[in-house]
Amino acid sequence: MFSKILTKVIGSRNDRTLRKLRKIVDQINKLEPQFESLQDEELKAKTIEFRARLEQGEDLDNLLPEAFATVREASKRLYGMRHFDVQMIGGMVLNDSQIAEMRTGEGKTLTATLPCYLNALTGKGVHVVTVNDYLAKRDAETNRELFEFLGMTVGVNVPNMPPQEKKQAYLCDILYGTNNEFGFDYLRDNMAFRAEDRVQRERYFAVVDEVDSILIDEARTPLIISGPAEDSSELYIRINTLIPQLVKQDEEDSEEYRGEGHYTLDEKGKQTHLTENGQEFVEQLLKDAGLMEEDDTLYSPANISLLHHINAALRAHVLFEKDVDYIVKDDEVIIVDEHTGRTMPGRRWSEGLHQAVEAKEGVKIQNENQTLASITFQNFFRLYEKLSGMTGTADTEAFEFQSIYGLDTVVIPTNRPMARNDMGDLVYMTEAEKFAAIIEDIKGCSERGQPVLVGTVSIEKSELLSNALKKAKIKHNVLNAKFHEQEADIVANAGTASAVTIATNMAGRGTDIVLGGSWQADVAKLSDPTEEQIQAVKAKWKEAHDAVLASGGLHIIGTERHESRRIDNQLRGRAGRQGDAGSSRFYLSMEDALMRIFASDRVSGMMKKLGMEEGEAIEHPWVTKAIENAQRKVEGRNFDIRKQLLEYDDVANDQRKVVYELRDELMNVDDISEMIGYNRQEVLEGLFGQYIPPQSLEEMWDVEGLTTRLRADFDLDLPLQEWLDNDDKLHEDNLREKIIEAAVQVYKEKEESVGESVLRNFEKAVMLQTLDGLWKEHLAAMDHLRQGIHLRGYAQKNPKQEYKRESFELFEGLLDTLKFDVVSILSKVRVQQQEDVERMEEQRRLQAEEAARRQQLQHQNAENQLDDGEGAEEAHSPMVREERKVGRNEPCPCGSGKKYKQCHGKI
């Protein structure tokens, strides 16, 4: 009560914001006569002046009144369109990184030109994000003349553009494109191998059109780039035939038989290592099999992949036993958990080991799709320094915009008062009765020349209604979201007298329905029209426009309520643009999905008590209230799901940032020798600690084991025991230092023999290639972890905390493995000359091109991302419970760890 009184006295937050912005609008309006007096060249020169002032340190907000006045004046001269004061307010809201809720027909496209121009003055680039390619191209072409007049460059970012064109587009001052394409470009840039292959620059300012659709409706669906894991089935099979010829080195008499065995075993670490003799023997086998050139060696840079396959096959044969480590069932290798003895279907060993075991057992080698990169829209758009958005319906989701993105919502008043008549809902017992009433309503409108837009929740329902209209001999158009270009034409003419248009909920967004039709479309049909012809078309349109207004304007019919009130408001918002007359009504039945699940008992009980006849409807504020409460429940549930997805993705996002920053650093420097040196020291110290524990007695040292590992992993043949025997003063610390010094010296000799620049290039290539391979495997491991983490709730553990803890352990493992593998490869691989590095680079480039050709870009269904059993927000799929009902005292399926009655059972 008190808060209501306070709001009346001082106004709401929205009112206070508008009052503050109106003062700036007054300043802009005072500048108008001054800007009207400028010549075209003087107006164009304003851009150069503003940029110079910014370079001298002037604040962007100080330039706002003059910049907005410049854009308004240019628009008046080029298009004959003057920005309304409310559009100026909308532009300021967008510039302040907020969401502007502007009703349909209030000119969002023109409003966006104001903050786009202002922020493009910085030279950092502005991205205008739309829901489809058609709107991106249309808006870019609509505003191109205005921006180019003011000295700005305009680009369009659409799928399948050549990389060079895309790179040029990103250099434009203002770039229009879809949310998917901006997101995929970001992921592709972070998979590039050379700095010049990247297309994006910094993410500075984004204006998201239809922001509710992009940041809320699509927020549960991550962007994923996936591709088939490297298809080397044939190579696994061929190498599998070579491995049985290898002989294990005799352990007991290793000194005596050294050189005769081909490999050594480390059963504790589940690793194998080729001996020097083994390496030569394998090289000969590979040459005989035609897998390696005659003058080549196993450790040359181009053969890193071959070495990887040999190691995997050797481990599969000598360390992994059938019916101990795995079983073969239904032509598939299934891992056995070493701790529990249970099988783990769906899990696969990494680093090619699983494929090697499949080759060994003669079953089909599976090359499953692998996630190469992924990100959610929440985390992608939060990368922008400034983010803003506009839509006709944001206020119902204001809390989510604020809590997830930190964006406040400002409701912009309409330029003219709203004149639309929103009538109460009519509820029928059956769908057949409801459709019959809709047909009658459409007939009545057609007879008096009133255009009708019918909104359906799915293509299936729109086809049902279309068939009913055909039977009633009522001419109509059906809109679906498949063909955006035709869609715009149909929507543009949906306001002509007696027009009947059926559209699914999202179809036609972004195109205004003008009463009387679009005179611009009629002019476009004329070839080289004269001014006289244009005026005749306008006069004809004016007559049609006035006739439609007299019939009551556009009438909106909703065939059922959507899960979200916001989608209902979007449908209503198609009518009553810019103060035009219009009306709306929703027709519901007890068979509708929303009514059946959430409101059926109460409302159907009320209808039965009233003793309703067939074809009779109920219209009461209580019914509308019950439906809105049901919608609030669904909105709350969907918000919880999006929030939960974000909490999980935030964990992956922190790791993604670290990996992408490291990649960025590697791409932008030529010399990473300091990083390699630091890693070498860390890896060798870690290995030393495994065999010679800190502050331990010499009797506890495993000198022989350390000697073997140094030889096998780093090609370091060091006589450690001899050093210790000959020097009594040699203790733990200086032995460690001596090993590191020896490793540095060997590497220095390698550098002197091949040349510094050759080795620097090779270091960078190895680091990038190893990082990318491990990151792909890490993403797969994170997917596996996500899929089963909700089960921790049954063990009274918090799944989110467990996910954070285990994913951190996985990531630490990735970083440790990266350091170890890079140091090991650089120590063992023999680089002869620059050609070796170029061969490796060429091989990698060809693989990357092939992978890019086979890549799949997915805007993945959220159902695969969440383990809470909740379905995706798709209006056309009826909400039917497929799984058994969750008991009140059982753990909640959302994975919170709470009981169902204390979590989602409350809703």
Swiss-Prot record:
Domain of life, source organism: Bacteria
Region (Disordered): 834-907
Cofactor: Zn(2+)
Comp. bias (Basic residues): 898-907
Keywords in alphabetical order: ATP-binding, Cell inner membrane, Cell membrane, Cytoplasm, Membrane, Metal-binding, Nucleotide-binding, Protein transport, Translocase, Translocation, Transport, Zinc
EC number(s) reported in the record: 7.4.2.8
GO cellular component: cell envelope Sec protein transport complex; cytosol; plasma membrane
Location relative to the cell: Cell inner membrane; Cytoplasm
GO molecular function, one term: metal ion binding
Cofactor note as given: May bind 1 zinc ion per subunit.
Catalytic reaction equation(s): ATP + H2O + cellular proteinSide 1 = ADP + phosphate + cellular proteinSide 2
Example of a GO biological process term: intracellular protein transmembrane transport
Biased composition (Basic and acidic residues): 836-853, 873-888
Residues that, per the record, bind Zn(2+): 892, 894, 903-904
Main location: membrane
Membrane topology, as annotated: Peripheral membrane protein
Pfam families the record matches: P-loop_SecA, SEC-C, SecA_DEAD, SecA_PP_bind, SecA_SW
SUPFAM superfamilies the record matches: Helical scaffold and wing domains of SecA, P-loop containing nucleoside triphosphate hydrolases, Pre-protein crosslinking domain of SecA
Function comment: Part of the Sec protein translocase complex. Interacts with the SecYEG preprotein conducting channel. Has a central role in coupling the hydrolysis of ATP to the transfer of proteins into and across the cell membrane, serving both as a receptor for the preprotein-SecB complex and as an ATP-driven molecular motor driving the stepwise translocation of polypeptide chains across the membrane.
Matching PANTHER family: CHLOROPLAST PROTEIN-TRANSPORTING ATPASE, SECA INNER MEMBRANE COMPONENT OF SEC PROTEIN SECRETION SYSTEM
Family: Belongs to the SecA family.
Record text on subunit structure and interactions: Monomer and homodimer. Part of the essential Sec protein translocation apparatus which comprises SecA, SecYEG and auxiliary proteins SecDF-YajC and YidC.
HAMAP family membership: SecA (MF_01382)
Name assigned to this protein: Protein translocase subunit SecA
Organism name: Aliivibrio fischeri (strain MJ11) (Vibrio fischeri)
Gene it is expressed from: secA
